[in-house]
Amino acid sequence: MADIDARLREDVHLLGELLGNTIREQRGAEFLDKIERIRKGAKAGRRGSAEGAEQLSASVDGLGDDELLPVARAFNQFLNLANIAEQYQLMHRRDDTQPLPFESRVLPELLDRLKTEGHTPDALARQLSKLEIELVLTAHPTEVARRTLIQKYDAIAAQLAALDHRDLNSTERAQITSRLQRLIAEAWHTEEIRRIRPTPVDEAKWGFAVIEHSLWHAIPNYLRKADHALHAATGLNLPLEAAPIRFASWMGGDRDGNPNVTAIVTREVLLLARWMAADLYLRDVDNLAAELSMQQASDALRARVGDSAEPYRAELKRLRERLRATRNWANASLSETLPAPEAVLRDNRELLDPLLLCFQSLHECGMGVIADGPLLDCLRRAVTFGLFLVRLDVRQDSSRHCAAMTEITDYLGLGRYEEWDEQTRIDFLLRELNNRRPLLPGYFKPAADTAEVLATCRVVAAAPTASLGSYVISMAGSASDVLAVQLLLKEAGLQRPMRVVPLFETLADLDNAGPVIEKLLGLPGYRSRLHGPQEVMIGYSDSAKDAGTTAAAWAQYRAQEKLVEICREQQVELLLFHGRGGTVGRGGGPAHAAILSQPPGSVAGRFRTTEQGEMIRFKFGLPDIAEQNLNLYLAAVLEATLLPPPPPQPSWRTMMDQMAADGVGAYRAVVRENPEFVEYFRQATPEQELGRLPLGSRPAKRREGGVESLRAIPWIFAWTQTRLMLPAWLGWEAALSKALERGEGTVLAQMREQWPFFRTRIDMLEMVLAKADSDIARLYDERLVSAELQHLGAHLRDLLSQACNVVLGLTGQKQLLAHSPETLEFISLRNTYLDPLHLLQAELLSRSRSREASLDSPLELALLVSVAGIAAGLRNTG
């Protein structure tokens, strides 16, 4: 551990020194001295020096308006460079004396354990190859880093790897350092922040870039290692057409609260995905054609290509022509609707079969070593990504469907749908679903909102089946919400099954999820249309905002248990879709632990979850890191399927019921019932300013109003910027303290020891409390909050202190995260660069609120840079 610390600090020191050189060259030595004084003041302040803290504060206060932006940029760049060093450290810095990282050994060790538990080799191979894990990439307003910069950061990581060789001579070391200096200078002189809000298409292109630069390479690598682990444990191989992990996307499909995502945008994103897939396969096939110059071929391949002297190249040439035709058609279709020529690839078999033919021929002719190289990689990609790269989900709020149905029934003279009771709605919807005639006449001219809903349904109906995932209904609360979407899709001409997925996201809706699904599955007209599993989405963000994470986590657990029970009774398979955020307050945290903490039976070989924008870069932005995270998902879902945790004991349930009640009471007493809270929130955090900044294509609010009108992301994000982290812990301090006051400490210890659900909750709570910082939060209050509201901030900081103390008591530690010195080291390293950014942000907010400033003024740009830097520094709580 000490060796890792020393090496990490060595890398950070080097990168910081090179950044300093760049800053000195542009701004002069005097300006660099200011930066260094601020950094040293922050470092001394962290060590408890009052003089250091005063020096830091005075240095920031003394900055002129023209210095605010470059100072903010300097510390933002420091944090991004520290992230690069940390990611590299976690991935590569291990010599032969150190054990393999957990992510690399988790699957082999699990397979050995499963064999010991009595699972046969055949059963293990069968289960691993039929796993269905889908990671759904979503846009996220806190992912503000530009793709241009991300590529430069990746190049810096590559140079750190090049430097990490003991046999380098001084000339080689100097050359690598020079390349690092150039890359850091390029990053410094590149504007890191978008000045205009990205469009949904921009966000989708960002997602495609992650696939192109990282996942495209990681997929065959992780599958090769999974195949090796399976063979070592069982003697069996992973089938060629196994794709345990696939990808879907919400970028360009999620229109909930985002008027910028229209039917036209969704069609464009579907075509862009098709173009991108064809382009990536073309690159692969070009490389394969260059490599596969062999003459010997199987009879099956000869039957296809005749007596060609280069049979593999001949077969690949045909595929290349079809891929080119597909790419050209998709590109042309972006500007006008065109029929697809015959050469365009329509079915994944048309892509797979030529590759399989070449693969099998090489094996038959004794050239397996060639087949198992890049050709196998291309095959694995073709199975995983298909012709459409990702499956696009569509998401819309239930109220939009209700409004559309109301306009339709009103027009038809049937009354107002929104005023009908639930049973009347169900009867009407089932009747129309079974009716062969259209519901609407061709001359119906709906209002703009209804027209957009219907246009979206028409895009869905026209799109190829394999290009789409699920139609998700946010704020679902009844069976009719699902049936209404089915009817709207039928009316648009959809003639194939499509998963229509209710998303239950408030506390009340989570409690009602079981009864709603039970009602749906009890309708013969619905069951006859259900092909495959019943998919249900569990919302983590809004339930936590509604009730606090204590009550929300328990409601999510109980809802899943109930859904498992109902689907088992109804003999229907269940697919749970987890709408987790990157932050703890939105259900985030390490995926491996989260999956293993799900209720028994809820992960039965299937798992679907969102991956949020800011976490996509950290978990999947580099091929090696993506590979590790794919390994973790694969192992966790396999373990949760074959070794599910036992159900909680009755006494634990009783305890959680009481803690949830105490937690929601304490949370709502602050957030909902204190009349001063909303005003304090708006003064103490950058919430108002975040709404003005170009952070993502979606508006920050659903509508005007208080906390309930905020989307979950800015709600969490605002508290994270000030380090109070309130949404992630508020309620737990009361729930745990009251349990201890009742003398139930032994039961709590037992729950933490024996129940993965509770242990994971406490671990996540401890992690977020370690990143929270009362002193930083107080600093914002002192500069931004009016005197009459200061007492509320002090009260919240007292509650934070209470939460820290009760968690320390529960874990038996003297310091949060004492059991994880590596994580503590990473937090400590970042604080030196975060502290000045927090102080700077508070000063920027103070200056911004006292004067009018245009969105492109240095003041506003510096504020945006500070937001991005703090998000980068805090990562999974950013």
UniProtKB/Swiss-Prot annotation:
This protein's UniProt keywords: Carbon dioxide fixation, Lyase, Magnesium
Q: Which domain of life is it from?
A: Bacteria
Family the entry assigns:
Belongs to the PEPCase type 1 family.
Q: Which reaction does it catalyse?
A: oxaloacetate + phosphate = phosphoenolpyruvate + hydrogencarbonate
Q: Which Gene3D superfamilies match?
A: Phosphoenolpyruvate/pyruvate domain
User: Could you tell me what this protein does?
Assistant: Forms oxaloacetate, a four-carbon dicarboxylic acid source for the tricarboxylic acid cycle.
Q: Which cofactors must be present for this protein to function?
A: Mg(2+)
Q: What EC designation does it have? A: 4.1.1.31
Lineage of origin: Bacteria, Pseudomonadati, Pseudomonadota, Gammaproteobacteria, Pseudomonadales
Alphabetically, which GO biological process terms does the record hold?
carbon fixation; oxaloacetate metabolic process; tricarboxylic acid cycle
**Which gene produces this protein?**
ppc
Family annotation (InterPro entries):
PEP_COase (IPR021135), PEP_COase_bac/pln-type (IPR022805), PEP_COase_Lys_AS (IPR018129), PEPCASE_His_AS (IPR033129), Pyrv/PenolPyrv_kinase-like_dom (IPR015813)
What NCBIfam families has UniProt attached to this entry?
PRK00009.1
One Pfam annotation, family name? PEPcase
Taken from the UniProt entry, a GO cellular component term is:
cytosol
Q: This protein is called what? A: Phosphoenolpyruvate carboxylase
Q: Which GO terms describe its molecular function?
A: magnesium ion binding; phosphoenolpyruvate carboxylase activity
